[in-house]
């Protein structure tokens, strides 16, 4: 666990790779998404609960990813996730995919809270904002 975030282990499976045993570029997004989802669980809420109880969803608003070094078949990796900014309807996540101390990829992901009935951004519920603000 990071001081201001969360670490999540990921194993690279055959299904994640191309014919050369290198992780296909889109799979990195899966790794980052899983880590954000598990991070939310550690803060005692899930996207499913927000959806069912409040008709709210977290959606990716912007995403920037930098591929530095290739991940390969059977690598055991760690996704490090930190919150760098919390605003009314958005949270900015900084994520790194690591093999030991080597950074393989990094991503900046801005996630927005959307009211699914209106399909418009809305402020995060108080309990969600409080969970992230205590980390700052």
UniProtKB/Swiss-Prot annotation:
InterPro entries: 4-hydroxybenzoyl-CoA_TE (IPR050563), HB-CoA_thioesterase_AS (IPR008272), HotDog_dom_sf (IPR029069), Tol-Pal_acyl-CoA_thioesterase (IPR014166), YbgC/YbaW (IPR006684)
EC class (word): hydrolase
Pfam families per record: 4HBT_2
Gene3D superfamilies xrefs: Hotdog Thioesterase (3.10.129.10)
Signal peptide start and end residues: none
Active site: 18
Enzyme Commission code: 3.1.2.-
Keywords: Hydrolase
CDD domains noted in UniProt: 4HBT
Single GO MF descriptor: fatty acyl-CoA hydrolase activity
Source organism superkingdom: Bacteria
Entries under SUPFAM superfamilies matching the protein: Thioesterase/thiol ester dehydrase-isomerase
Role played: Displays acyl-CoA thioesterase activity with short chain aliphatic acyl-CoA thioesters, such as propionyl-CoA and butyryl-CoA. Enzyme activity is relatively low, suggesting that the acyl-CoA thioesters used in the assays are not the physiological substrates. Has no detectable activity with 4-hydroxybenzoyl-CoA, lauroyl-CoA (C12:0), arachidoyl-CoA (C20:0) and arachidonoyl-CoA (C20:4).
UniProt record similarity statement: Belongs to the 4-hydroxybenzoyl-CoA thioesterase family.
Stated name of the protein: Acyl-CoA thioesterase YbgC
Organism annotation: Haemophilus influenzae (strain ATCC 51907 / DSM 11121 / KW20 / Rd)
């Amino acid at each position: 666990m990071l001081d201001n975030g969360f670490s999540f282990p990921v194993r690279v499976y055959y299904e994640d790779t191309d014919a050369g045993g290198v992780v296909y570029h889109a799979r990195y997004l899966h790794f980052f998404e899983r880590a954000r989802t598990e991070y939310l669980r550690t803060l005692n809420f899930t996207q499913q609960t927000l959806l069912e109880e409040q008709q709210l969803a977290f959606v990716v608003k912007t995403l920037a990813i930098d591929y530095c070094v290739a991940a390969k078949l059977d690598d055991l990796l760690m996704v490090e996730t930190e919150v760098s900014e919390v605003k009314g309807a958005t949270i900015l996540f900084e994520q790194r995919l690591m093999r030991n101390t080597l950074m393989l990829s990094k991503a900046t992901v801005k996630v927005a809270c959307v009211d699914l009935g209106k399909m418009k951004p809305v402020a995060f519920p108080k309990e969600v904002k409080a969970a992230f603000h205590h980390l700052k």
